[in-house]
From Swiss-Prot:
Residues 63-80, 149-161, 250-263, 362-371 are extracellular. The chain crosses the membrane at residues 42-62, 81-101, 128-148, 162-182, 229-249, 264-284, 341-361. Residues 1-41, 102-127, 183-228, 285-340 are cytoplasmic. PANTHER family: GUSTATORY AND PHEROMONE RECEPTOR 32A-RELATED, INVERTEBRATE GUSTATORY RECEPTOR. InterPro entries: 7TM_chemorcpt. One of its GO terms (molecular function) is taste receptor activity. Expressed in the adult labellar chemosensory neurons, and adult thorax and wing. In larvae, is expressed in neurons of the posterior pharyngeal sense organ. Belongs to the insect chemoreceptor superfamily. Gustatory receptor (GR) family. Gr21a subfamily. Signal peptide: none annotated. Its main location: membrane. This is Gustatory and pheromone receptor 39a, isoform A. Gustatory receptor which mediates acceptance or avoidance behavior, depending on its substrates. Plays a role in sustaining courtship behavior in males, possibly through the reception of a stimulating arrestant pheromone. It is a multi-pass membrane protein. The lineage of its organism: Eukaryota, Metazoa, Ecdysozoa, Arthropoda, Hexapoda.
Amino acid sequence: MSKVCRDLRIYLRLLHIMGMMCWHFDSDHCQLVATSGSERYAVVYAGCILVSTTAGFIFALLHPSRFHIAIYNQTGNFYEAVIFRSTCVVLFLVYVILYAWRHRYRDLVQHILRLNRRCASSCTNQQFLHNIILYGMLTILCFGNYLHGYTRAGLATLPLALCMLVYIFAFLVLCLLLMFFVSLKQVMTAGLIHYNQQLCQGDLISGLRGRQQILKLCGGELNECFGLLMLPIVALVLLMAPSGPFFLISTVLEGKFRPDECLIMLLTSSTWDTPWMIMLVLMLRTNGISEEANKTAKMLTKVPRTGTGLDRMIEKFLLKNLRQKPILTAYGFFALDKSTLFKLFTAIFTYMVILVQFKEMENSTKSINKF
């Protein structure tokens, strides 16, 4: 078993512990096996998550005042309530999707693991390790921000415990899925590099066949399975992104903290959503599949013509490649690549402006009511 496969097994182990992909890895046959015990574990874990998220959503809906932060304005408290409920809904949806399509996910991941075994590289191995280290560091930062921020803001004990539990668990689950998706894309990129090297060496038939298999998998199962997951995850991160800056504007910059607390709260608010945004940017910037696929066409244009049937095959491939765009999408709503980053940051800035406008309207209403 290659060293890269061992690194990918870290993701599989973490996903198994969190009840998302409960399989055992057979290293001899590079096969994922679902046992009766793992199936029971998946059912029980998913059931607990569905019950817990539903209970949290209902509690927040029936008792919104319990989650109010005294130093925050009405707009901010409403926004925080929306984020909490949305997080519960997204966790609910993710576990429903993963359990309902567990057999499709198993076949997909197993196929990519076998591709990884054939096309392993030390560069990809380092990327897997770096992703895991980054995931751990951002989890610690996220935990520290939430604990310190909500404690200093004066949130009551019960809602504080609920917010910590829901948000930290959501970060662990959703960002692990983002990291795993990034790693799968890196495996497929390594596969395309491998087959492009075969093309350079003159092995056209094998190289083109392998390349088409990867792109078919990318545009088919990978797109459908993970595109559906990425849609609610990206939407949630987009919703959460303005919360830190808005809290900073509404409390710290308006002097609602003591002078000795301002600096630490300024730092906490500034980095509040940083872990989520780093994960999202990493997922969207990992775009090696499209880059390597485009390299194939450039290589084939340099192949000398021989006057045989191979020339016609290359010409057909190039014509097809002009129409084919191996871009991963969130179920067709937007592309999961670097082109989406600018649109997302524009949307975040727009949401931020809207929130600030509502805050100003609230302050104006309070001023009028005083007279």
